[in-house]
Curated annotation (Swiss-Prot):
This is Intermembrane phospholipid transport system binding protein MlaB. The gene is mlaB. It comes from Escherichia coli (strain K12). The keyword Cytoplasm applies. Part of the ABC transporter complex MlaFEDB, which is involved in a phospholipid transport pathway that maintains lipid asymmetry in the outer membrane by retrograde trafficking of phospholipids from the outer membrane to the inner membrane. MlaB plays critical roles in both the assembly and activity of the complex. May act by modulating MlaF structure and stability. Disruption phenotype: Mutation leads to accumulation of phospholipid in the outer leaflet of the outer membrane and increased outer membrane permeability. It confers sensitivity to SDS-EDTA. The lineage of its organism: Bacteria, Pseudomonadati, Pseudomonadota, Gammaproteobacteria, Enterobacterales. GO terms for molecular function: phospholipid transfer activity.
Length: 97
């Protein structure tokens, strides 16, 4: 069973906690535009697992923030996230470092 996903915006940082798993993404997906408003950093240090659905949502959050005029960095990213992106042949710069 998947752990829940929670998020909190503190200043310009969106901190995610739990699993970025397809089974628990819907609440964040529904709040995505509000969740990224004004953010320049997405903190994944409390994320325990990311699947392909979670990676897709993460990429979408980054894109939404960029469309709002913000450059986004990632913090606390597990190397497995970058490996997953590489396995799907995503461009190296799709996930900011």
């Amino acid at each position: 069973m998947s752990e829940s996903l929670s998020w909190m915006q503190t200043g310009d940082t969106l901190a995610l906690s739990g699993e970025l798993d397809q089974d628990v993404l819907l609440p964040l997906w529904e709040m995505r535009e509000e969740a990224v408003k004004g953010i320049t950093c997405i903190d994944l240090s409390r994320v325990s697992r990311v699947d392909t659905g979670g990676l897709a949502l993460l990429l979408h959050l980054i894109d939404l923030a960029k469309k709002q005029g913000n450059n986004v960095t990632l913090q606390g990213v597990n190397d497995k996230v970058y490996t997953l992106a590489k396995l799907y042949n995503l461009p190296a710069d799709v996930l900011p470092r």
